[in-house]
Amino acid sequence: FYTRSFTDAEKALSQGKKVLLNPEKEEINGLEGKFVQVFWSPVHFPNQPGTMGIFCDPTHPALADFPTEMHSNWQWWDICKNATIMELDSLKNNMQPIVRMVDNFYKNRNLSLLFEAKAGDGKLLVCSSDLAKSLNTRPVARQLRYSLLKYMESDKFNPQEEVTFKQIKQVLHNVNRTKEEKKSIYE
């Protein structure tokens, strides 16, 4: 079951379904998706939006039909530019993302573009990059979506970590955090 709505995902998970939750990036309370690293040093320019790249396991079955290395490469450009990066620190259960966005050493948060978990009676995959819009002109997003849905249909989709609906909502819509402001590094 693919949805962009947390409410629909919660309902489907309560019914024991497998869900790919792909919220609108504007609805996610996180960091602006960037492909390039932070400029210079976060010590001197601490409020820069951006991360230090991607770290993932290219052999993870969720990425079986999405060619990648364990690090950022050009196929990730569109995925990152059309994403809001999720911060998983509030989960407090050592959640290991499928696709980790590497934070800078100054903040060192647990950042994710893609993670999986058991939720309610179902199984959940959350992707914070837009996998819905303009897929006819975005072959990379189309391929990642295909790979994730194929993974969910398989017996290999068996998340180990468990999260509550409240925790998922916190990651996506935490009212206690605000999006990092987009500032020029020269201000």
Residue ranges with predicted function:
Residues 10, 22, 116, 124, ...:
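Functionally constrained cores in energy, signaling, and assembly domains
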Residues 140-153:
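Short amphipathic C-terminal alpha-helix that caps PH/PH-like domains
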Residues 25-32, 41-139, 157-187:
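Catalytic beta-strand/loop cores that center a nucleophilic Ser/Cys/Thr
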Residues 19, 154-158:
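A general structural signal for well-ordered secondary-structure junctions
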Residues 1-38:
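Short, well-ordered secondary-structure micro-motifs within conserved domains or adaptor modules
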